[in-house]
Amino acid sequence: FFGSMIGALAKGLPSLISLIKK
């Protein structure tokens, strides 16, 4: 469970950062 959650975070973080840095 936690493994998949960390995977989702790892996938979501880059997109969030790119949105903030836009």
Curated annotation (Swiss-Prot):
Secreted among keywords: yes
Q: Does the keyword rRNA-binding apply?
A: no
| GO terms for cellular component | extracellular region
Residues bearing Lysine amide are: K22
User: Keyword annotations for this protein?
Assistant: Amidation, Antibiotic, Antimicrobial, Secreted
One Gene Ontology term from the biological process aspect of the record: killing of cells of another organism
What is its subcellular localisation?
Answer: Secreted
Q: Write out the tissue specificity statement of the associated record.
A: Expressed by the skin glands.
Please give the family membership noted in the entry.
Belongs to the frog skin active peptide (FSAP) family. Brevinin subfamily.
What this chain does, per the entry, is described as:
Antimicrobial peptide. Active against Gram-negative bacterium E.coli (MIC=12.5 uM) and against Gram-positive bacterium S.aureus (MIC=12.5 uM).
What's the protein called, per UniProt?
A: Brevinin-1OKa
